[in-house]
Amino acid sequence: MNSVARPRIIYGTAWKKDRTEALVIKAIRHGFRAIDTACQPKHYDEAGVGTGIAACISDTLNREDLYIQTKFTPVSGQDPYRTPYDPHAPLAEQVTQSFATSLSNLATSYLDCLVLHSPLADAKRTAEAWRAMEAISDAHGARQLGISNCYNLEYLEALHRSARVKPAVVQNRFYAETGYDREIRVFCAERGIVYQSFWTLTANPHLLAHETVAALAAKYARTPAQILFRYLTQEGVVPLTGTTSEAHMREDLEIFAFELRDEERRAVADLLRS
């Protein structure tokens, strides 16, 4: 299962509302090959993502060329008036129903990754949801499983120990309040787990404005955002970008046209520790 090709950067679709389909089309046409969404109508138009993907599938782009990732969002994260599954059903059935809704919304027969949007109220409930996701994995409905919004290393370690299908992805907000998940990122790297970052730019205006980043941006004729994204990708992190700007889409994909030197990466790393 974990042999799935790792995307280098992912287009995120939260909060796009009725612009979702058009933005997904633009992202794919500019070159994004990984899309993140969620079965959570409160913040995502998952069906719009599916329609956008379908519009891009052609003789030159197959479903297999795309990495499609969605999430099971627990009841606590749903709009009670728009929950995409029966909130009164047993938890395992909620996961199954949400997954079926996602396949329908995304017009696909499988997911590249199914992510638990957040840990549940306690470890027992989280394990129950994970077992339901493992059943989906067993049936080849999801090629990988992951967890998001998991900032407690001990919690992640316990899930990893107990899981029969190990987490292949951890997707967390990348910000100073959690120390940029230093320990979690080490844990992931040691176990071949892909660490995905979100809010990478939004939560870090101080990094983007720092003179170290500004100097690197000037040296490489890039933007501060490109410097931060490139640093992270060279560290093995897969960033999400939810930009609505086509110019920024192009810039985000252009980060792989240059590389930071080792001493430059150390300088940026020092900023994350300060």
Question: How would you name each of these model-derived features?
Answer:
Residues I35, L111-L114, L145, V170:
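Hydrophobic residues within beta-strands of alpha/beta enzymes
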Residues S118-S274:
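Beta/alpha (TIM)-barrel catalytic core signal, keyed to glycine-rich beta->alpha loops juxtaposed to Asp/Glu
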Residues F32, T108-L111, A142, P167:
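A structural motif
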Residues M1-L66, T70, E128, A203:
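N-terminal binding-site loop/beta-alpha segment at the start of enzyme catalytic domains
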Residues S104-A123:
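Active-site groove signature of glycoside hydrolases
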Residues E64-A92, H117:
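Structural motif corresponding to the early beta-alpha repeats
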Residues K16-I28, H88-N105, L153-E157, Y180:
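Short, acidic/polar
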Residues K26-R29, G50-Y67, L103-T108, A135-S137, ...:
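Acidic (Asp/Glu)-rich catalytic clusters
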